[in-house]
Amino acid sequence: LPLAKRFGNDRDPNLCGCFLYLATLAQKKGDYDAAIRWYRASLPGIPVDRDEWSSWGIGLAGLAMAQDRLDLAARLLSATEAADIETNRMWPIYQNDCARLVSEVQSKLSAERFDAAWAEGRVAPFEQVVEEAVSILEATLAVRGQLAPT
């Protein structure tokens, strides 16, 4: 990451895609500290790599669920589905993951809370929802003592 910033490449979609996949790998290993750092590093790629929006949204929704941030997960999933309606770029494997996560979140939240979070995710720009989610998850992990200070 320091080299990418030094040479002005931190917005390169290939580099940001690598950061996104590193976030996914760290998350699957249960290393949420590393995952959120990689998600943060990948954010500059969002405006230029719309093909990966479902990876950001679904991955962060899974991380939010792991941290008991169910309203945030619903908002992310809603924004991800809204972006897919606009771009039609969600890969089939992500469609299955998204449907599974939506069902899981919906079963854990009251209908009122789910509907409110879902409505928020539908109206906000995808980039904004993802950036806010990363900040919220960083704060959540820091409070729980899982995120080392930078």
Give the residues covered by each predicted segment.
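Adenylate-forming
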Residues: 25, 40-44, 58-64, 78-82, ...
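Solenoid-repeat scaffolds in large eukaryotic assemblies
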Residues: 35, 42, 53, 72-73
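Residue signature of alpha-solenoid helical repeat architecture, marking inter-repeat boundaries
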Residues: 10-13, 50-51, 92-93
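Amphipathic alpha-helical segments of tetratricopeptide repeats
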Residues: 1-8, 40-48, 79-88, 122-123
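Residue register of alpha-helical TPR repeats
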Residues: 13-17, 24, 55, 62
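C-terminal non-catalytic interaction modules
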Residues: 69-150
